[in-house]
Amino acid sequence: MSKAIVLDSHLKEKGSMELPKRYEGINSHNLYLYVKHYLSSARANTAKSKNRAEVSGGGRKPWAQKGGGRARAGSITSPVFVGGGVSHGATNKRNYNLKINKKQKRLALEYALEEKAQANKLFVVEKIAIKGVVEDNKRKHLTKEANQMFQALEQRDTLFVCMNMDEYTELAFSNLKKCLIIDVNELNAYLLAAFSSVVMEEAAFQHIVQDKTEE
């Protein structure tokens, strides 16, 4: 059974927490479907080319139908002309969103969490809180403290997951390129797959692993 590594206040390993047995044997295809759904939903769909009805000009016939030796033409907006409309071009009317049901979303999240645990990249801490130093009635060195926490983990990049994130902690991590801090309600399978390691507050971890199949 896969386990999350529990860290103390100095980010040193002090124990482990087991993932529920239902996390075992989940098909990886659920994660594939969720990633496709996530990326397609984020697609802006702004590419647009003009067809022959939308380009300007073309009000008159460019040359006589017969007698010129050239192929007949009715308008310079035809796709065969330079500056004419585009055939089968990009359109912004297409909907790229791919549907996925709640069960597949849950299975994708559980599979991604299981993968992190198997790779020993899932960590649990009691609390993620950056307070900084108060100087002249202002909180300073927030980012420095957050960076020290990240460096102590010795990971390539890290996703931090809080139960109830305060504004100072959010600000502290906002300037770190290799970190992202989110609230537990924002957690999804794509973010779990995108980062090489995950650090969760204990309350957030318990919230995620509780059985939601009966809800």
Swiss-Prot record:
Keyword hit for RNA-binding: yes
Keywords tagged on the record: Ribonucleoprotein, Ribosomal protein, RNA-binding, rRNA-binding
UniProt key word Ribonucleoprotein: yes
Gene3D superfamilies named among the record's database cross-references: 3.40.1370.10
GO CC annotations on file: ribonucleoprotein complex; ribosome
UniProt biased composition (Gly residues): 56-71
SUPFAM superfamilies in alphabetical order: Ribosomal protein L4
SUBUNIT field: Part of the 50S ribosomal subunit.
Entry protein name: Large ribosomal subunit protein uL4
Gene symbol of the encoding locus: rplD
